[in-house]
Design a protein with these regions (language model features):
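N-terminal membrane-targeting/pre-transmembrane regions
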Residues: 1-142
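Alpha-helical hydrophobic membrane-insertion segments
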Residues: 16-27, 153, 157-161, 167
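N-terminal membrane-entry
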Residues: 142-156
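Long, charged, alpha-helical interaction scaffolds
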Residues: 151-155, 167-173, 217-222
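Conserved beta-hairpin
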Residues: 158-198
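Acidic, Ser/Thr-rich low-complexity segments on the non-lumenal side of membrane proteins
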Residues: 188-228
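A membrane-cytosol interface segment of integral membrane proteins
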Residues: 218-273
Length: 273
């Protein structure tokens, strides 16, 4: 490595994969919560109340035919005046549900109701319409539906934040030449302005911190070798090469090889060996 050589460390595949995984994860969560808030819970409520109506219809038929004298005309007349037991709050029901909703035709059919098997009729009804025959144990409240929208909004915000940092990091790099170090923010700082190089976390976490003071004031540089450059030997360990370059040009105080408490050194990602 010559004195004039420039070492450039770009974002590592390790970081990009993790960041992209976070974006995808929260994106999937946002879609799932959106689906439940927009249609999922409301459709399940529709199934719940329809199923309850089938059970009630079976009970009504049994009571009216207790003496065995109920006629088909009497049942059709009664069933035609009945409505599905939907709540008045349309916000918890499937979109375009116009109340009142009359009983399905299958419940108005005397011959099909006569065996008093509402569960079988329910399965036939749902099979004909290609919907899930298993209703939820309890209906979802308006509050539960609002919560899906809230969590969807939170996940969407996290996607935007994570995506912002991912895009920003992809465009960044850390580099060092014979005169200065250029940080990931694009600030160029001469080696002569570097005061302290803290390497206590370099061996365990791939982190180093440099204090500097130039004409604009004091500051700190954070070098994350796992994010920029990496330590893969097949790539000639770009982060290590960058650090060797910095150390070869550094004339300030170096702090290194401190012993960490077990609880401190065990957490987080470790620098690859």
């Amino acid at each position: 490595m010559t004195a004039s050589e420039t070492i450039v460390c770009k974002p590592t595949p390790w970081f990009l994969f993790r960041a992209l995984a976070i974006v995808v994860m929260f994106g999937v969560f946002a879609v799932l919560f959106y689906r439940d808030g927009a249609t999922g819970y409301r459709k399940k409520n529709g199934i719940f109340y329809l199923n309850k109506t089938f059970q009630r219809a079976g009970g009504d038929f049994s009571k009216m035919n207790a003496s065995g004298t109920l006629t088909a005309a009497e049942w059709r007349k009664f069933a035609a005046t009945q409505a599905v037991d939907f709540p008045e709050d349309s916000s918890v029901l499937p979109a375009n549900t116009h109340l009142p909703v009359p009983w399905p035709a299958i419940l108005q059919d005397y011959e099909r109701m006569k065996p008093l098997q509402p569960n079988i009729l329910w399965r036939e009804y749902t099979k004909e319409r290609g919907v899930n025959s298993g209703p939820p144990e309890e209906p979802y409240s308006a509050q539960a539906i609002r919560e899906q929208w809230i969590v969807c909004g939170i996940c969407t915000l996290l996607v935007l934040v994570a995506g912002f940092f991912l895009i920003r990091t992809v465009r960044r790099s850390i580099s060092a030449d014979g005169e200065a170090i250029t940080t990931q923010t694009g600030k160029r700082i001469a080696f002569a302005d570097l005061k302290t190089l803290d390497l206590r976390k370099w061996e365990t976490k791939g982190l180093a911190f440099i204090d500097y003071e130039d004409k604009l004031g004091k500051g700190k540089i954070r070098i994350d070798g796992l994010t920029y450059g990496g330590f893969k030997k097949e790539n000639d360990e770009p982060a290590e090469r960058l650090m060797r370059k910095i150390r070869s040009c550094f004339s300030g105080e170096i702090i290194e090889y401190a012993t960490f408490r077990a609880s401190e050194s065990s957490g987080g990602e470790s620098k690859p060996s």
